[in-house]
Amino acid sequence: MKKVSLEQELKGNAYPGRGIVIGRSKDGTKAVAGYFIMGRSQNSRNRVFVEEGEGIRTQAFDPSKLEAPSLIIYAPVRVLGNDTIVTNGDQTDTVYEGLEQGKTFEVSLRSREFEPDAPNYTPRISGVMHVENGTYGYQMSILKSNNGDPSQCNRYTFSYDNCVAGEGHFIHTYMHDGNPLPSFEGEPKLVEIPDDIDAFTELLWSSLNEDNKVSLFTRYIDIATGKYETRIVNKNK
């Protein structure tokens, strides 16, 4: 697979929707995650990320303007032992509870499907990073309608073992802006991952469409020790 520029992918797409990037730092020492949300409606834009325990949750910036909270208020990031879960919806909890019960990432997500927001039927995208005893691997998933037909849910899981230094994968909900919004197609895109969390955070935030970007989370986990650094950027302040 040809490696693509994360910067160009984002700058060339006004509305990829929600996006997950997972990979390994260039020096090989850090497990890396990024998650961003965007919005076109006032309701979608009325959000911020806040820290909650070892993870984060979304919160209404102006509670008086909050509508339909079920699809926009959730915990995108949760940590269970050696696993860090990142998703674009409340399936974070589904994966967390499944792993807790001994299920796999893929099996945990079998109880879920795309979001019921017709006509877009927004895909549910998810990732899990496993860091243990100096080893690191990750999985990504997308659950989406069958080319806009909600009678069928198409399920794809991608597993990456013994991750290569300086590489990662990027998956997002929509191919581009549109009405209805077309679901992501193909494998997660192969991208470069830098060593520095602040450089990675700046790369993502500065490349996202200025009008549509809402919030960004990044995390670098030391593969040897499990200690991590986190950055959160919110457009609403």
Give, region by region, the residue ranges found by the protein language model.
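Conserved short alpha-helical segments that host acidic/polar catalytic motifs at enzyme active sites
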Residues: M1-K237
